[in-house]
Amino acid sequence: MSVADVKKNAEQKMQKSIEALKTDLAKIRTGRAHTGLLDHVQVDYYGSMVPISQVANVTLVDARTIGVQPWEKKMVQAVEKAIREADLGLNPATMGDIIRVPTPALTEERRKELTKVVKGEGEDAKVAVRNLRRDANEQLKKLVKDKAISEDDERRGGDEVQKLTDKFVAEIDKLVAEKDKEIMTV
């Protein structure tokens, strides 16, 4: 294993932390409707839990309404129940075989709560990135101990890992700021 391997490994894991943050932030509801809001809703489909996208078409009706059309008519009740119980603050209404899910406007208080949640998610991602930096630095120290690299190489590798960490922390800050702005925009 070389310094480049340690750096590449750390970079890949840090990128996964960013992807996880993006996924978590997408679940946080803003004032506008988007189909990703229901991505993690699980529906009881003949005894097994499956994502809503596997049993229904999820579309945007307008800026504040999501339309859900189950492929099987008898799944309408199960899908509606799953959306209601998903703890998203949504209240679906069934019209025939189409479920309309209006997204209520966020109150100022709820917006502030959501920005705290967003900042918390950002902090968790930063902690993950910093832990990956620590792991990479420990790997570099182990390589020096095993005499696979010199101390100068370790120092250079540590500097490169720090630059990576700074880059990913800046990206996390940017994502959090964008989501905050999206939430606070009425």
Swiss-Prot record:
GO molecular function per UniProt: ribosomal large subunit binding
Keyword Endoplasmic reticulum: no
Pfam family, one: RRF
Localization: Cytoplasm
Gene Ontology BP, a term: cytoplasmic translational termination
Stored InterPro entries: Ribosome_recyc_fac, Ribosome_recyc_fac_dom, RRF_sf
Principal subcellular localisation of the protein: cytoplasm
HAMAP family assigned: RRF (MF_00040)
Entry similarity comment: Belongs to the RRF family.
Function statement: Responsible for the release of ribosomes from messenger RNA at the termination of protein biosynthesis. May increase the efficiency of translation by recycling ribosomes from one round of translation to another.
Protein name in the entry: Ribosome-recycling factor
